[in-house]
């Protein structure tokens, strides 16, 4: 099976450890991931520069994987990444990562589906009707 060029979307401050675990599972092309240092550098920039960076990253990828932690669905940049990936007709999927342990061995409560927040099409249907958000089997 071919590996996809993936852009991972997640709440950096709370879920970067969990995101690293997912990235290190080896299920996606290593060229598709960015380092924690990339986000550390870009998060200090203006909103316009952050959007530019996200747009550039998404343009190089075939799909968006949203790693859903306890409060991911309320995060500004995660929501922007979902909106932009939808506009660019990228594949989109979500994975609940609440069962993965952080660096202290702690798990968190399951977060709400971030795709539920988006209304699409003429009939204003919820994106969550079309985009799956899986539960991680890892813990």
Locate the predicted segments by residue.
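C-terminal interaction surface of TIR/SEFIR-family domains
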Residues: 1-7, 14, 18, 103-139
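Conserved N-terminal substructure of TIR/SEFIR domains
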Residues: 1-60
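Short, glycine/charged-enriched secondary-structure capping and boundary segments
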Residues: 21-24, 79-82, 107-109
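Structural signal for conserved beta-strand scaffold positions within catalytic alpha/beta enzyme cores
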Residues: 34-36, 94, 117, 132
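Flexible, active-site-adjacent loop/turn segments at secondary-structure boundaries
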Residues: 37, 48, 75-76, 113-116
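Conserved protein kinase catalytic core
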Residues: 42-43, 100-102
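A broadly tuned preference for mixed-charge, low-complexity surface segments
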Residues: 50-65, 116-126
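Conserved beta-strand-loop-alpha-helix hinge of the TIR/SEFIR fold
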Residues: 57-101
């Amino acid at each position: 099976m071919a590996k996809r060029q993936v852009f991972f979307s997640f709440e950096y401050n709370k879920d970067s450890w969990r995101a690293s675990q997912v990235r290190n599972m080896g299920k996606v092309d290593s060229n598709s991931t960015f380092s924690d240092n990339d986000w550390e550098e870009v998060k200090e920039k203006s909103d316009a520069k952050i959007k530019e960076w996200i747009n550039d990253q998404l343009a190089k990828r075939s799909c968006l994987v949203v790693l859903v932690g306890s409060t991911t669905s309320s995060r500004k940049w995660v929501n922007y990444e979902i909106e932009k990936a939808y506009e660019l007709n990228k594949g989109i999927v979500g994975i609940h990562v609440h069962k993965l342990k952080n660096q202290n061995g702690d798990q968190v409560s399951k977060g709400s589906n971030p795709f539920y927040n988006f209304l699409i099409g003429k009939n204003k249907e919820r994106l969550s009707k079309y985009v799956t958000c899986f539960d991680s089997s890892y813990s």
